[in-house]
Amino acid sequence: MPKIKKKGQAGAAKNYITRTQAVKKLQLSLPDFRKLCIWKGIYPREPRNKKKVSKSATASTTFYYTKDIQYLLHEPLLQKFRDQKVLEKKISRALGRGDVSDAARFERHAARPEATGKPRYTLNHVIRERYPTFNDALRDLDDCLSMLFLFANLPSTSAVPAKMIARCERLCLEFQHYLIVSHSLRKSFLSIKGIYYQANIQGEDILWLVPYKFNQRIVGDVDFRIMGTFVEFYMTLLGFVNYRLYSSIGLKYPPKFDQLKDENGAELGAFSLEGVNMATQGETKAVTNGEEQQQGPDPKVQAEVDKIIKQLKEDESKSDETAEEDAEADDEEKPTDSIDKFEPVAPGGDVLPQPAYSSSDPSQLFANFTFYLSRETPRQPLEFILRAFGCKRIGWDSVLGEGAFTNDESDPSITHHIIDRPVVQAATNEDGDGEDNQTAQKVGPNQRYPGRIYVQPQWVWDCVNDEELKSPELYAPGAALPPHLSPFVKAAPGQYDPTLPLEAQQTEAEAIEADLEDAEKGNAEDGSDVENDMDVDEAEDDEEEEEGDEEDAEEAEEEDAEEDEEESKTLQRQLELEAELQGKKVQNTKVDSKTKAKLEQRKALEKKAREEAEDLERAKGMLSKKKRKLFEQMQYTNNKKSAQDEKLRAKRRKLEKEKAQKA
C-alpha cells in the first residue's frame, strides 16, 4: 500500500507562501519586507486555486513563491535591517528603564546618515544582480527617469525630504548633459501629462515623461513611502548608468557642480564637463618639459632616428608611385555616391523601404542659429532640446536664471526669437502715424527687431520630430498653429492618418456622399424649380425642332428628351423621399448629369455591398461555431475602428469646408 502524503507537503501548497509566513520566516517588519521585495524585484503571485494554497481557515490574499522567499534569506541587506531593529529595541528599553546615558551611547554608535554622511546601507550589489549587462539597465530606464524627474519637481515635505529632491534633480541634469554631448535625443512631444522625450542610447530606445514646471500639490491619498522606496533604488540605478555613459564618451564623472549657480537657477549651466585625461595630460606635459630643459637628446640615438626617418620617406615615395599607377588603372570603375534601390524580385513581392540620403545631420539642426527665449516661454525644456540638437548660443531674460549666452534682447547676433505671448495692437501717436516696427529703438507691444525670425515654441518641437526646419510663417506669433501630432504613434495601414490628404484615404462611398451633399446645398442655394427648368427644356426642344431638317431626327430627339424627363422625375422622387426620411425640407431641384452619375455610382456600390454581405454570410455558415464566434468578434472590432475613422474623416472634411468658405 503506498504511503499517504500529508496535506500541504507537495504541489501548489508547497510552491506558494503567504505574506505573513514570509515576514515571520525573514524576521522582518512589514515595511522592511516591502522594501526588500521592491529592491530585489520580487512581486506577489496569483495561484490558480487559493483554497489549495491557503493552509489557514481565513482566506489569504497575498502569496509569494517559496523559492523567492528562500532566496531572500541570503540577502546582505537582511542583516542590516535586523541590526537596525535590534538597535531600536535597545534604545527603547534603555529609555524605558530611565537610563538616558545608555540610550545616548547606543545612539552615538548607530549608523546615522544625517550625522556621519555615510549611508546606512547601499544598493550597489542589488543593481549588479538585477542588471547583469548594461543593456538590461538601459531597457529598465524608462520608469526610472519618469519617477526621478517627477520627484525633482516636487516640493519638500516630511515624506519627501529636500535631500532626496536635490539628488534626483542633480542626477537628471547629469543625464541630460550626456544626451546633449552625445546628441542621443531623437523625439519629443507636448502632452497634457507633461513632455515626452525619446532617446536612443547604444541601440536602445528610451521613453520617459517630464512634468511641467508648475507648483505641485501633495495630496494625502498617495503613499510616498512606497514611492520613496522605488526612488531610492532608481537613484542608485541612474548613478550607475550615468557613470557608464560618461565613461563611454571620455568624460569625468561626476561633473563639477557649482552650488552658487544652481541656487541662482542655472540648472544645466551649473555643471562643467571635463575629460578623463585632462588633468593627467597637464601633469605629464609639465614633467616632460622639465626633463627636456635638464637633459638634451643623445647624439647617437638622434643619428639612428634620422636614418630611420630617411628610409621611411623613400618608402613613401615608392608607394605614391604605385598608388598613382593603380589609380589610373581603376579610373574606369569609379564608385558613385548614389544609393542602391531595393526593387522587388518578382511581381507582387514585398516592397522594401528605400534608404534615404540626407546631407544634413539632424543632430546639428540648430547649430547655426542663436536663440532668445522670452520670459513667458518654458526655458528648461527649450534649452535642453536646443542644446541637444546642436545649438550653442541661447539667451534669455535674467529673470529666468543664470547660464544664458546673453541677457540682452537687442543683441544683433540673435537669429530666432521664441515668443508665446498674444499679439497686442501697437499704440499710435496723436497724429495717427504709428511708429515703424523695424526702426523702433525700444521694443514695445507687437514690435519686432529687424532681421530676426519670430516663432512660437511649437516650432522647435515640430522641427525636431520631422528632422527638418519647418516654415516659420506657420508658427508666427498670433498665427493658428498646425496640429501637434505625436511622433510615437504610427498609423496602421487602412487607419485614419492625419498627415495624409483626405482624398487619399477616404472610401469611394464617402467621396460620393460628400459630392451629393455639396450638390444638394448648391441646388438649395440656387432655389431653381423643376417646372421652370422643364419650360426651358421644352423651349430649347422647340427651337431644335424648327431648325431640324429631317423628321426622323426630330422624332429621335423627342424620344431622348422624354427619356431624360422620366429619369429626372424618378431621381427627383428619390431625392424627395430621402429628404422626407431625414426630416429635411423638400425642394424641387433639377438633377443634372453629374448628380445622376453619382446616384448611379451609389446604387452600384450599395448593390455590391449587399452582394458581398450575402457572400460573407454564406461563408460564415461553413465555419464551425467556435471559429464563427471568433470571426464575428474580429468583424465587430474592425467595424468599430472603421466607424471611428469615418467620424474623424467627416469631422476633417467639415473643418476643411469651413476653412475654404472663410478663405
Curated annotation (Swiss-Prot):
Question: Coiled coil: which residue ranges?
Answer: 501-663
Q: Which GO terms describe its biological process?
A: maturation of 5.8S rRNA from tricistronic rRNA transcript (SSU-rRNA, 5.8S rRNA, LSU-rRNA); maturation of LSU-rRNA from tricistronic rRNA transcript (SSU-rRNA, 5.8S rRNA, LSU-rRNA)
Originating species: Neurospora crassa (strain ATCC 24698 / 74-OR23-1A / CBS 708.71 / DSM 1257 / FGSC 987)
Quote the InterPro entries the UniProt record gives: BRCT_dom, BRCT_dom_sf, PES
Q: Does the keyword rRNA processing apply?
A: yes
Alphabetically, the GO molecular function entries are: ribonucleoprotein complex binding; RNA binding
Q: Which cysteine residues pair off into disulfide bonds? A: none
Supply the alphabetized keyword list: Coiled coil, Nucleus, Ribosome biogenesis, rRNA processing
List the protein's name: Pescadillo homolog
Renumbered to this chain, region (Disordered) spans 311-360, 428-447, 504-663
Which PANTHER family does this entry report, sorted A to Z?
A: PESCADILLO - RELATED (PTHR12221), PESCADILLO HOMOLOG (PTHR12221:SF6)
Q: Which residues cross the membrane?
A: none
- Database matches in SUPFAM superfamilies: BRCT domain (SSF52113)
Q: Which domain of life is it from?
A: Eukaryota
Xref: CDD domains:
BRCT_pescadillo_like
Tell me where in this chain the BRCT domain is found: 361-477
Q: What does this protein do?
A: Component of the NOP7 complex, which is required for maturation of the 25S and 5.8S ribosomal RNAs and formation of the 60S ribosome.
One GO cellular component, as annotated: preribosome, large subunit precursor
Output compositional bias ranges, type Basic and acidic residues. 311-321, 591-620
Q: Does the keyword rRNA-binding apply?
A: no
Acidic residues bias locations:
322-334, 526-567
Q: Which Pfam families match?
A: Pescadillo_N (PF06732)
Which cell locations does it reside in? Nucleus, Nucleolus; Nucleus, Nucleoplasm
